[in-house]
């Protein structure tokens, strides 16, 4: 009867009803006796109610007996208030915890004495701690729900205590809050939750790490109140309310030592002092700590603003591999200090020991520090969320994410169970075999051995992933023989070593090494950089020895060192990443142009570290997103242009490096070059429009468009392509003057605007120029206005344009314009290209143009792949000729891209299949080789003087067995193309 009455009102949401298989009993008889012995001492109705719940739910009964056996702390909470236990067991834990917090807030809001608040918060803590522990032990909540509940409890406790203290201060007239019920709002007092509390990951018996800041001009302070003494006193009161131990316990231990320079600063710091400290003295561990920082109490708006100001300290603009060694040093020091240098079971510290929680956190945080500046999506607080994003962005493998996530959840569960024993902030397992046997049962295992097997498996997997990141001897120095690399050319041991590595000129290499090791170059004058470089040299020499021409590779790296103005980051990057060093060695050996770019701007190397580097080439949407991140916080027009230039140079460098490494087809690279240019053009168009309008206003109904011609229009760009552009505009005739302070008439307005636009591209800053711009393809060329109104452009194309201008128009593509204006321009272009034409006249004009080009540029150089007889110009002219002649009857032939136009012509039966089978492979061959030559050669290409690295890359790009075979194929191809050109269009050889 009692049993049914007690359990009848329970539904399946009640905590008691939701217990699953949990702990096991080490000594079932003794545990049952201990539990029953306590029940005997209770009032009969309480004992009957608790016993009935245990009988109804056997898993709950075992869990309660396990607590009596293994956890003095939880058993004390149970024995201290049996009614509290019944409340917790009968209610749904989610609703019960919410009600506990709500009731506590109501009580504290009405309290007038600090003692009342302290008592209320301790009652809250006791019941919430019991509820959360039971949800953990019974498997009712997953681990991260447990940590979030603990975090919410801590956060709300801090908020209640702080609000009470500020309410008291308001009553004393020391602050004048606009909202007396929420005196913290607008107070300028900021409480940051750090570490696990900041990330929603608080453990069961954790301290709470807080940093308290205040604004010097705190708006709610009374005029005669000094900020520092006031906020220090409030902070001390907050700490006292939460952590003072009394007969009814404590709420949370408070640790304020994560603030700047805690040994010499007060417990509350001004935001001005904090920002100055982080800018001048902030260390890597403080950057790592700030990843998880979160405003948890006080003025939350001011807290968010402060974190935004601190963000540049935490998130460096460029990849920061120096953080690797800093973080690893921190971890090593902790392990050494705590004697946790090996994996174990008995006594092992699951937090800071080998393979522990801290290694998982550091694994994630270090990579967040390295890349979070460039990739804002990595700026997340929770560890598991960071692992998820790192895997999604290919910074880590899916296997690493899964194994580290599983280990983290397991170790956090172990950590909680250890702390539940005595409510101690310990992370160490019991240190005897018998104690581990007992603990294993409390955790749900049937033996010490089964627990140890799982524990060691998780620890070893974590250590393996951590070691790959931190301890893999990234420089490779540990495996190399102990040679004095600075000994110079007289040291026979060094010379023998260099010969054994494959260097053919050891005397020269030894001399160069001596210069490096003595710090003779500008970049090596900084002691820390010089020391890092000396440690890196052995691995560098070994890696450069793998090049096709090792001696040339050393010379190329030497040129890079001499050209560097600052190189600490570059040396750090290369020393931590052997694959990157291999790639840079290839760049230096084959493409001096890219090497020079790297010397001027070492930060462009960052993109090579991005896991996406070897993936699919980014499309326009992804490029736009990256560009937006690059420009997000530019503070001025000049900084905006500098960042655009850096983005453009880095993109060129990355695409070029992929071409050299053979990891992207050259046609894709051509499109990628064009996509980068198009994104930059659109961005500059918008920026200049806004800047220009701020001075000159706007013309009513104005619209501007940028028309891409040439290689940008056809999306066939190379690393050295300039931009062929035409600016087209329109406006309402009834109001032709702009409405700005300095008004301009229509045509003058757009001419001046176009000049400003060109200047944005071509002005040289510290980061060089964006692009060279060529506007000679506009109507009337240099003789015409720099910008064309749409009706004038249409009239010119219809009535005055030469055949060569219509040939060029086949590549015209609107790349930046409002949609409606874009459509109008495209209609004009299509109308021009699809009008009827006389094939004989067009053929004659094209042949004449080709002869003129040959006379001006020459056509006898086989390696002038553009202008040689049978070169790319011949193929372009064939594709353009076919479009002009046939577009009237077959408009589907039209395409801005040469290969696509040839495909269309073949599909429509306008180009013979046999001719297409010559022209298409020829175009691809020329484009493949041209991409390489534009990257690697500034002047004309001469095979006799070209380096072996370049020739090797060209042979690979041309899919030939060797260079002589490649050259023979080029000559044969040119002969075949010229024959088709003469047959289709006519020429001197026809």
UniProtKB/Swiss-Prot annotation:
| SUPFAM superfamilies cross-referenced by the UniProt entry | Nucleotidyltransferase, Nucleotidyltransferase substrate binding subunit/domain
**Which chemical reaction does it catalyze?**
[glutamine synthetase]-O(4)-(5'-adenylyl)-L-tyrosine + phosphate = [glutamine synthetase]-L-tyrosine + ADP; [glutamine synthetase]-L-tyrosine + ATP = [glutamine synthetase]-O(4)-(5'-adenylyl)-L-tyrosine + diphosphate
Specify whether ATP-binding is a keyword of the entry: yes
UniProt keyword annotations, A-Z: ATP-binding, Magnesium, Multifunctional enzyme, Nucleotide-binding, Nucleotidyltransferase, Transferase
Gene3D superfamilies found in the cross-reference section = 1.20.120.1510, Beta Polymerase, domain 2 (3.30.460.10), Nucleotidyltransferases domain 2 (1.20.120.330)
Q: Where is this region: Adenylyl removase?
A: 1-474
Coiled coil segments of this chain: none
Q: Name one Pfam family in it.
A: GlnE
Highest taxon of source:
Bacteria
Q: Which GO terms describe its cellular component?
A: cytosol
Q: For the region Adenylyl transferase, give the residue spans.
A: 478-990
Name the EC number(s). 2.7.7.89, 2.7.7.42
Functional summary from the UniProt entry: Involved in the regulation of glutamine synthetase GlnA, a key enzyme in the process to assimilate ammonia. When cellular nitrogen levels are high, the C-terminal adenylyl transferase (AT) inactivates GlnA by covalent transfer of an adenylyl group from ATP to specific tyrosine residue of GlnA, thus reducing its activity. Conversely, when nitrogen levels are low, the N-terminal adenylyl removase (AR) activates GlnA by removing the adenylyl group by phosphorolysis, increasing its activity.
Q: Which family does it belong to?
A: Belongs to the GlnE family.
Q: What is this protein called?
A: Bifunctional glutamine synthetase adenylyltransferase/adenylyl-removing enzyme
- Species classification: Bacteria, Pseudomonadati, Pseudomonadota, Alphaproteobacteria, Hyphomicrobiales
Gene symbol? glnE
């Amino acid at each position: 009867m009692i049993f049914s009455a007690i359990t009848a009102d329970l539904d399946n949401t009640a905590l008691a009803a939701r217990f699953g298989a949990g702990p096991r009993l080490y000594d079932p008889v003794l545990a049952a006796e201990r539990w029953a012995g306590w029940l005997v001492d209770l009032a009969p109705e309480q004992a009957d109610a608790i016993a009935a719940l245990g009988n109804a739910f056997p898993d709950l009964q075992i869990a309660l007996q396990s607590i009596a056996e293994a956890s003095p702390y939880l058993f004390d909470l149970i024995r201290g208030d049996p009614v509290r236990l019944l409340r917790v067991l009968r209610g749904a834990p989610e609703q019960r915890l919410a009600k506990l917090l709500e009731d506590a807030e109501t009580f504290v809001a009405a309290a007038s004495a600090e003692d009342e608040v302290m008592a209320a918060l301790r009652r809250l803590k006791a019941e919430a701690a019991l509820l959360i522990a039971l949800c953990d032990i019974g498997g009712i909540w997953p681990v991260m729900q447990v940590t979030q509940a603990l975090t919410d409890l801590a956060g709300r406790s801090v908020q209640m205590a702080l609000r009470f203290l500020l309410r008291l201060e308001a009553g004393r007239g020391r602050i004048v809050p606009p909202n007396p019920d929420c005196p913290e709002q607008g107070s300028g007092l900021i409480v940051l939750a750090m570490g696990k509390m900041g990330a929603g990951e608080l453990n069961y018996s954790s301290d709470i790490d807080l940093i308290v800041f205040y604004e010097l001009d705190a708006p709610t302070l009374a005029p005669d109140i000094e900020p520092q003494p006031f906020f220090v006193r409030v902070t001390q009161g907050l700490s006292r309310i939460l952590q003072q131990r009394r007969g009814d316990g404590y709420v949370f231990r408070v640790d304020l030592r994560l603030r700047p320079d805690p040994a010499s600063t007060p417990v509350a710091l001004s935001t001005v002092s904090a920002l100055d400290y982080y800018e001048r003295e902030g260390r890597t561990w403080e950057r790592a700590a700030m990843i998880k920082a979160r405003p948890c109490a006080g003025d939350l708006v001011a807290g968010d603003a402060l974190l935004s100001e601190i963000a540049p300290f935490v998130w460096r603009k460029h990849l920061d591999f120096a953080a690797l060694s800093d973080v690893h040093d921190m971890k090593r020091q902790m392990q050494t200090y705590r004697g946790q240098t090996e994996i174990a079971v008995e006594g092992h510290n699951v937090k800071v020991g080998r393979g522990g929680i801290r290694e998982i956190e550091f694994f994630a945080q270090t990579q967040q520090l390295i890349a979070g500046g460039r990739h804002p999506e990595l700026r997340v607080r929770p560890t598991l969320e960071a692992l998820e994003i790192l895997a999604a962005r290919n910074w880590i493998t899916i296997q690493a994410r899964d194994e580290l996530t599983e280990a983290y959840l397991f170790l956090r569960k172990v950590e909680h169970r250890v702390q539940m024993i005595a409510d101690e902030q310990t992370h160490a397992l019991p240190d005897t075999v018998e104690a581990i046997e007992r603990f294993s049962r409390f955790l749900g295992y049937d033996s010490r051995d089964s627990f140890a097997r799982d524990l060691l498996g998780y620890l070893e997997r974590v250590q393996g992933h951590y070691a790959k990141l931190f301890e893999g001897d990234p420089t490779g120095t540990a495996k190399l023989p102990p040679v004095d690399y600075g000994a110079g050319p007289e040291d026979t041991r060094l010379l023998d070593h260099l010969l054994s590595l494959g260097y053919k000129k050891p005397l020269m290499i030894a001399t160069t090494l001596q210069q490096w090791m003595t710090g003779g170059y500008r970049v090596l004058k900084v002691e820390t950089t010089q020391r890092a470089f000396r440690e890196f040299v052995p691995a560098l020499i070994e890696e450069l020895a793998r090049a096709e021409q090792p001696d040339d590779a050393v010379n190329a790296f030497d040129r890079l060192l001499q050209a560097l103005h600052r190189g600490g980051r570059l040396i750090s990057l290369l020393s931590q990443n052997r694959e990157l060093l291999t790639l840079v060695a290839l760049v230096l050996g084959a493409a001096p142009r890219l090497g020079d770019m790297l010397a001027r701007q070492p930060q462009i190397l960052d993109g090579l570290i991005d896991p996406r580097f070897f993936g699919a080439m980014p499309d326009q949407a992804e490029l736009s997103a990256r560009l937006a991140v690059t420009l997000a916080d530019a503070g001025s027009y000049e900084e905006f242009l500098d960042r655009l230039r850096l983005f453009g140079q880095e993109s060129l460098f990355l695409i070029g490096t992929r071409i050299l490494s053979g990891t992207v087809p050259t046609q894709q690279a051509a499109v990628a070059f064009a996509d980068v240019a198009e994104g930059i053009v659109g961005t500059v168009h918008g920026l200049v429009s806004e800047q220009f309008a701020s001075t000159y206003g706007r013309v009513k109904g104005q619209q501007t468009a940028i028309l891409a011609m040439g290689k940008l229009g056809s999306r066939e760009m190379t690393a050295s392509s300039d931009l062929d552009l035409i600016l087209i505009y329109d406006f309402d005739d009834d109001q032709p003057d702009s409405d700005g302070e300095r008004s301009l008439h229509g045509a003058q307005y757009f001419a001046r605007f176009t000049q400003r636009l060109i200047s944005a591209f071509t002005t040289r800053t510290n980061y060089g120029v964006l692009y060279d711009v060529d506007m000679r393809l506009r109507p009337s060329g240099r003789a015409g206005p720099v910008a064309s109104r749409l009706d004038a452009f249409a009239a010119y194309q219809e009535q005055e344009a030469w055949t060569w201008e219509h040939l060029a128009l086949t590549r015209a593509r609107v790349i930046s314009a409002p949609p409606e204006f874009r459509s109008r321009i495209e209609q004009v272009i299509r109308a021009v290209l699809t009008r009827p034409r006389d094939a004989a006249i067009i053929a004659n004009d094209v042949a004449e143009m080709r002869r003129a080009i040959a006379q001006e540029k020459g056509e006898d150089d086989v390696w002038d792949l553009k202008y040689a007889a049978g070169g790319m110009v011949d193929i372009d002219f064939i594709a353009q000729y076919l479009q002009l002649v046939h577009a009237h009857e077959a408009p589907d032939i039209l395409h801005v891209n040469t290969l696509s136009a040839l495909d269309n012509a073949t599909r429509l039966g306008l180009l013979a299949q046999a001719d297409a089978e010559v022209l298409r492979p020829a175009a691809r061959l020329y484009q493949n080789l041209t991409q390489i030559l534009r990257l690697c050669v500034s002047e004309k290409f001469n095979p006799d003087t070209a380096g072996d690295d370049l020739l090797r890359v060209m042979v690979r790009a041309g899919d030939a067995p060797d260079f002589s075979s490649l050259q023979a194929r080029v000559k044969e191809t040119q002969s075949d193309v010229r024959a088709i050109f003469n047959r289709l269009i006519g020429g001197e050889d026809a």
